[in-house]
């Protein structure tokens, strides 16, 4: 990380100086805001943490509960989510505290000893090279803690307003400044019944499956239920089951159980299949107790013992997959130039719900907000046209439907009994195979956005085949030329709203002044059509909107910084300090770590990889196609 840009400042560099633009936190909610976020779950806090980086955007986040979450609910953190946490600069802390999921084992009835279970398979949880981060497990409350700390340490010093419930949301599309009016009711004992009104430019409902914001804009969760009750419990238990510290899927004659080891080395989560429900029956009517969950888990684990000592948290739920047709207040099914601009959005469980079996609920919700946050910031800061906001619903609804389809099949296979002989059910081998085949999806790296205003046509994909247009930027190791430090290239991308331009030089670029990379630098630095010149505000650092990074195919010892264009060594900040962290080489020291080979980059021609602020590849272009680069940004950015 970089700091001391504008002079030496002692103390923790992760605590940004408080901005004079940010108002002090008050007990009462502000009367007017740019963005009102409803809900302090994963979706709401991801959005709040991202917007907190911009003190010129007035953000307010409210929550119905009276304080931060302390226990329970989601715990799985996918590889893709860890990549996002790196952008928020707390991935390392999560890695130290979390439980890493390395292998998954599969158990079924022992054909040699009826009534007992036996291990029949083992697979690696995520395939090699899928991400630089593992799949980990950590209590959702601790994830919230990291986001809250990020917000407190931001230039905005953003903090939630708790104990507020949404009563009403009204939209006046004729109002120019603050078209959305939200009525809140305070629900803590000291202020019960007090009414507050907030006017906002935009409202985002991250208030869960029973979202009041969703209801206010007339959206509905549509889908079905599997009519199957499940229980979930976090336990401290003594057991002789040998795989209790692995992720385990058990299909037995007594039912089905999913075991998830938790952080700390002792805590374990059990998902326990319970009763089949009648049509239209709610799980609450069964009055299932934690004692029943424990007894069922003990029967499924036979002949192994399970002595539960403590249950910090437990719950019951029914499997269901539901989704909204759109994630904003615009009535048109497909936005047109005549469509009104969206003013109210929904994210996370407010717009899609599914079973927890694949561990995607919290992860997918955070990706919703990561998609929306940079777009709101770009529009509010007048960097992009407001029509950009239509892409939130169009991008996220489609991939959520893909998740629903996967989850429906996965949950069904998990609930079906293990097939034995000629009897019905699911073949345990097919169950294991399905898990392996969909590993990219469960790791969170399977999202693929279709061509659109933001996503190119992939006409030049062959120049960098491993950076698929429309998918997340798949990081790889590099060596920084200025100090020979090995690092991950993707970790240059922070949650700061900036675009990344990764320019991979051709083999002969260093020796040829008219080469693709050097010509690109001249174009970006001085041409009137350059996006850097057109869209970077006057007086700001040259990389404040577009962060250009160069990667040469030669070893770092063969790249002379003093011969490179000034754009790759830009002066920045009040003191004009040089940024020495823009130039990289592949890791040629360790076999199999060359980024050009790993990501299929054309070593002769090179390539320009354009990456969105949410870490998704927007374009792969030839280094010399300056017109295409300009046309892309001109389609949605404002000068």
Swiss-Prot record:
Q: What is the effect of changing residue 257 to A?
A: Broadens the substrate range rendering it able to transform phenol to catechol
Reaction(s) the record says it catalyses: 3-hydroxybenzoate + NADPH + O2 + H(+) = 3,4-dihydroxybenzoate + NADP(+) + H2O
Enumerate the UniProt keywords alphabetically.
FAD, Flavoprotein, NADP, Oxidoreductase
Instruction: Give the main EC class.
Output: oxidoreductase
Q: Where are the transmembrane segments?
A: none
EC assignment: the record states: 1.14.13.23
**Which molecular-function annotations from GO does this UniProt entry contain?**
3-hydroxybenzoate 4-monooxygenase activity; FAD binding; protein homodimerization activity
Q: Which cofactor does it need?
A: FAD
**Result when mutating residue 292 to R:** In MobA3-1; able to hydroxylate 3-aminophenol
Q: Which SUPFAM superfamilies match?
A: FAD-linked reductases, C-terminal domain, FAD/NAD(P)-binding domain, Thioredoxin-like
Alphabetized NCBIfam families for the sequence = PRK08294.1
Q: How does it assemble?
A: Homodimer.
Annotated function:
Converts 3-hydroxybenzoate (m-hydroxybenzoate), and to a lesser extent p-hydroxybenzoate, to 3,4-dihydroxybenzoate (protocatechuate). Also acts on a number of analogs of 3-hydroxybenzoate substituted in the 2, 4, 5 and 6 positions.
**Family assignment from sequence similarity:** Belongs to the PheA/TfdB FAD monooxygenase family.
Q: Could you identify this protein by its name?
A: 3-hydroxybenzoate 4-monooxygenase
Q: Which organism is it from?
A: Comamonas testosteroni
Gene that encodes the chain:
mobA
